[in-house]
From Swiss-Prot:
Species this chain originates from: Mus musculus (Mouse)
Highest classification ranks of the organism: Eukaryota, Metazoa, Chordata, Craniata, Vertebrata
Keyword Transmembrane helix: yes
Extracellular compartment residues: 107-110
Any one GO cellular component localisation term in the record: plasma membrane
Pfam families, alphabetized: CD225
Protein's UniProt name: Transmembrane protein 233
Length: 110
């Protein structure tokens, strides 16, 4: 007998069902976490009275989700970040509009 493994044993190590075939460096689609698409934030921003801006945020968020599903992880991350900032801008614009409306309404003399 030789001290080396036979060809059938070394071939079994390359089989995909063996635990030796999987390494930590192998990344599959299930291993990559989904980037944030901020859908919840864009839905909340839709309740603010800045309608063109918050609809754009919602579109960015949905595009981010679609990009992730298509396998474009960098595009999904970029679109999610855009959705976040546009939603924040929409909320700020909405709060300013509400504040100005309240100031005008309550500053009038009865």
């Amino acid at each position: 007998m030789s001290q080396y493994a036979s060809r059938s044993d070394s071939k079994g190590a390359l089989d995909s069902s063996s635990p030796e075939a999987y390494t930590e460096d192998d990344k599959t689609e299930e291993d990559i976490p989904a980037p944030s698409n901020y859908l919840w934030l864009t839905i909340i921003s839709c309740f603010c009275p800045a309608y063109p801006v918050n609809i754009v945020a919602l579109v960015f968020s949905i595009m981010s989700l679609n990009s992730y599903n298509d396998g474009d992880y960098e595009g999904a991350r970029r679109l999610g970040r855009n959705a976040k900032w546009v939603a924040i801008a929409s909320i700020i614009i909405g709060l300013v509009i509400i504040g100005v409306s309240c100031a005008v309404h309550f500053s009038r003399n009865p």
